Amino acid sequence: MLLSLVADELMSNAFSATTMDWSAKQHEYMQRAIEVAEKGRGQVRPNPLVGCILVKDGEVIAEGWHDHLGGLHAEQMAIHDAEEKGHNTNGATAYVTLEPCNHFGRTPPCTEALLWAGISKVVIAHGDPNPIVRGNGISVLENAGIDVETGLLEESAATQMREFLHWCENRRPYVTVKVAVDVNGSVDDLSKDAGRFTSEDCLKEVHRLRKDCCAILVGANTVIRDNPSLTVRLIETEKQPLRIVIDPNNKIKSNSKVLNDGHKTKHLTDDFRGLAAMLDMLGDLEIQRLLVEGGPSTITKFLDQGLVDEFIYVQSNITHESPKLSSFDLTGFTKSVETVWGEEKVTIYTR
């Protein structure tokens, strides 16, 4: 998908949802399309998650999702799935979470695939966020005589694609901060050597979070104190996130794990020009979601400059003997999720 910075004057051409009453069945079909799109999570960046369901005579005959970068798009996979199952797609309705593309990229246009398959109606959750191509897919389909309806579960699709949409609109990554504390809000026990104090099940959720991010960032002090790997280890992944270490004074040791384990690390020393400039640089590298796992100093700098989009607060039930207490100003954030990771309470705040 061709991507560009969203210009304010172009937003007037934005995707507008069809005004209509959707049936319970239609909600069910689109919800299923959103669910199957999740199968591509962590495998398709910088492309978005997309799912597609084909329905004919009131029955789901096929489903597809964007599975990996360079692979079939969701619509193409759904059509292939129908063929594999022996279903005739002529006259079917496609429920797709993102406006079908109408340009040649790593794959041919999805609009052509839908036309070739004889799809008679396309229901779209969310429009293409790129103002240069937005609406072109819809226009091509409508001009070919296909009935197009838009906006079904648009907010749900937007939530699923939030990092992608944020990147398209801002050319910067969506910034998630994750911090773990003891029962009293201490981030570290200074009486002990550095080490994890959360449960194994919580760590697995952290690794799931890491897998969903393009890059992981810490400051020099975290590397010096913890010597972390900052990799995804407890769940399967095809690609490790880029590690970023902010170290303007070049303090970390040359034998640190992040510099010697064979995975990619961007070590920012005298080339560090501030957080805003760094986020611009990461946006140019197609980094769509950045996970900040640094200490209080690094986290506070991100918060003070208004650069955090999501804040994940993980609270253990243990008590540090020699606590390093910290507080974070979350003015402007809203508590969006309360959950549990293993033995830890987790609160997620979003801006």
Language-model segments: what does each one mean?
Residues 54, 59-156, 242, 301-303:
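Zn2+-dependent cytidine deaminase-like catalytic core
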Residues 44-58:
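N-terminal glycine-rich anion-binding loops that anchor highly charged ligand groups
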Residues 2-6, 10, 14-48, 106, ...:
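Enzymes that bind and transform nitrogen-containing heteroaromatic metabolites
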Residues 43-44, 70-71, 138, 152-180, ...:
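Proteins enriched for Cys/Gly/acidic motifs involved in redox and nucleic-acid/cofactor modification
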Residues 126, 161, 191:
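Short, flexible helix/strand-to-coil boundary loops that buttress conserved ligand/catalytic motifs
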Residues 53, 93, 176-180:
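Residues embedded in well-ordered beta-strands
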